[in-house]
C-alpha cells in the first residue's frame, strides 16, 4: 500500500509542446529577445524618431538653424552671451538633442550583444553580403551615426562582422527614406545625386576594400575564439519562461552597464569638444572666399562633428538659401552626419586605430572631392 501510494503521489511528467519537432521551451529565449526588441523599436520609431523626422521634413527651410550641432533647445542664451555662455549652452542643447537617440542606441546595442552571446553569429566571409545585411538593418533604423555607435559596439562585442557594424552605422543616418526625400526636396538634384553617388562608393567599394585590408592584417582566429566563449545551449530547453526571462535580463543588464560605462563618457566628451570647436570657428569669414585650404581645414573638422540625424541636410539647405558658395554647401552635406568623433573613438578603442584613421581620412578626402565636383554639376 505504501508503494502504491508513493507512486500515485509522483507528479505527472510534463508533456512537451512541440514546434517543428522541438520543445517550445527551446524558443523561450528567442521569444523574450524578440518581444523586447519589438517593444523598444515600436516605442522609439513611432513615439519619437519618425514623428521627429517628419517634423524636420515639414519645417525644412521655414526657420533659421540655431546651431550646426544641435536641433533641440534646452538652455537659452542670455541677452549678451559670452563665449563661455555659448559653449555651455551648446553642450547642454547637444545632450538634450541626443538624449532619445543615444538611449535607444545603448538599449539596442546591449540587446545585440546579448543576442550574439546566446546565439553566436556565423562569421561568413562574403564582405558584400555582410555589408548588405548592415545596410538593410541600418537604413530603416533612423538613428544618427553617433547613436548607432553603441549598436555597432554591441554587434562587434558579440563577435559579429565588422563590415556589418560599419555599414549599419553609416547607412542609418544617410539611407533613411525621410532623409533622402529631404535632400532632394530642399536642394537642387545635383547635390542629392552627388551625395548618394559618394555614399554608394563608401558602402559598396571603399568600405569592403578597407575591411578586407583590415582582415588580412589580423591573426587567424580559431573557431573557438571567433565566437563567444560562454555556451548556453545545453540548458536552453530546460527552463521555464520566467526563468529564461530572468536569465536574459541578468545578462542584458550586465551588457548594458558595460556599454554605458564605455559610451556615455565618450558622448559627454564629444559634446564638449564639438561645442568648443563650433563656437570658435569664424564661419562667416571662411564662407566669404573659396580656397583649398579653407575647404580642407573645414573638412578635417566637420567630419568629426557629432550631429543629430538630418541636421546635415538642414544646415546645407540653409547655406544654399543664404547664397553660400556651392563647395561649402556640398562639403557640409557630405561630411556632416556620416562619420564623427564618436564612431572614430569607438573604432580606435574597440576595433583598430588604423581602421579608425583610415575611415576618417577617407571621409575627409571624399568631402573635399565632393566640394570641387559639385561645381562641375552646377556649371
PLM feature spans:
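Intrinsically disordered, low-complexity non-transmembrane regions of multi-pass membrane transporters
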Residues: 1-38, 54-81, 216-255
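Juxtamembrane and boundary regions of transmembrane helices in multi-pass small-molecule transporters
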Residues: 36-56, 123-124, 130, 184, ...
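Membrane-interface helix termini and inter-helical loops of multi-pass transporters
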Residues: 51-56, 81-90, 280-289, 376-379
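Individual transmembrane alpha-helix segments
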Residues: 81-104, 109
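Alpha-helical membrane-protein architecture signal
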Residues: 84-88, 129-133, 242-253, 297
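Transmembrane helical segments that form the transport core of multi-pass membrane transport proteins
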Residues: 105, 111-123, 249-324
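Alpha-helical transmembrane segments of multipass membrane proteins
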Residues: 109, 141, 202-207, 211, ...
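Membrane-interfacial helix-loop connectors
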Residues: 134-198, 280-355, 360
Amino acid at each position: 500500500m505504501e508503494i502504491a501510494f508513493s507512486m500515485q503521489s509522483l507528479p505527472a511528467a510534463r508533456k512537451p509542446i512541440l514546434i517543428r519537432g522541438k520543445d517550445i521551451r527551446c524558443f523561450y529565449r528567442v521569444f523574450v529577445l524578440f518581444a523586447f526588441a519589438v517593444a523598444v523599436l515600436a516605442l522609439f520609431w513611432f513615439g519619437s524618431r519618425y514623428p521627429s523626422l517628419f517634423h524636420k521634413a515639414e519645417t525644412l527651410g521655414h526657420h533659421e538653424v540655431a546651431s550646426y550641432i544641435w536641433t533641440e533647445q534646452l538652455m537659452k542664451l542670455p541677452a549678451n552671451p559670452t563665449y563661455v555662455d555659448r559653449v555651455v549652452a551648446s553642450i547642454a542643447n547637444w545632450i538634450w538633442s541626443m538624449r532619445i537617440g543615444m538611449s535607444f542606441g545603448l538599449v539596442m546595442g546591449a540587446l545585440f550583444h546579448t543576442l550574439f552571446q546566446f546565439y553566436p553569429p556565423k562569421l561568413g566571409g562574403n564582405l558584400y553580403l555582410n555589408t548588405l545585411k548592415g545596410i538593410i538593418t541600418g537604413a530603416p533604423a533612423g538613428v544618427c551615426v553617433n547613436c548607432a555607435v553603441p549598436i555597432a559596439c554591441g554587434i562587434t562585442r558579440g563577435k559579429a562582422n565588422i563590415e556589418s557594424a560599419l555599414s549599419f552605422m553609416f547607412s542609418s543616418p544617410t539611407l533613411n527614406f525621410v532623409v533622402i526625400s529631404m535632400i532632394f526636396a530642399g536642394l537642387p538634384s545635383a547635390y542629392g545625386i552627388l551625395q548618394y553617388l559618394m555614399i554608394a562608393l563608401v558602402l559598396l567599394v571603399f568600405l569592403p576594400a578597407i575591411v578586407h585590408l583590415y582582415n588580412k592584417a589580423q591573426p587567424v582566429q580559431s573557431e573557438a575564439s571567433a565566437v563567444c566563449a560562454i555556451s548556453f545551449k545545453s540548458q536552453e530547453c530546460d527552463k521555464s519562461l520566467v526563468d529564461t526571462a530572468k536569465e536574459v535580463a541578468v545578462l542584458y543588464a550586465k551588457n548594458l552597464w558595460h556599454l554605458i560605462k564605455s559610451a556615455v563618457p565618450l558622448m559627454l566628451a564629444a559634446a564638449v569638444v564639438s561645442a568648443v570647436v563650433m563656437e570658435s570657428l569664424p564661419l562667416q569669414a571662411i564662407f566669404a572666399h573659396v580656397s583649398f585650404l579653407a575647404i580642407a581645414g573645414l573638412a578635417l573638422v566637420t567630419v568629426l562633428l557629432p550631429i543629430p540625424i538630418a541636421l546635415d541636410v538642414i544646415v546645407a539647405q540653409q547655406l544654399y538659401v543664404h547664397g553660400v558658395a556651392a563647395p561649402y554647401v556640398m562639403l557640409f552635406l557630405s561630411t556632416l552626419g556620416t562619420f564623427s568623433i564618436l564612431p572614430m573613438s569607438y573604432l580606435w578603442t574597440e576595433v583598430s586605430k588604423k581602421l579608425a584613421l583610415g575611415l576618417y581620412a577617407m571621409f575627409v578626402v571624399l568631402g573635399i572631392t565632393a566640394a570641387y565636383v559639385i561645381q562641375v554639376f552646377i556649371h
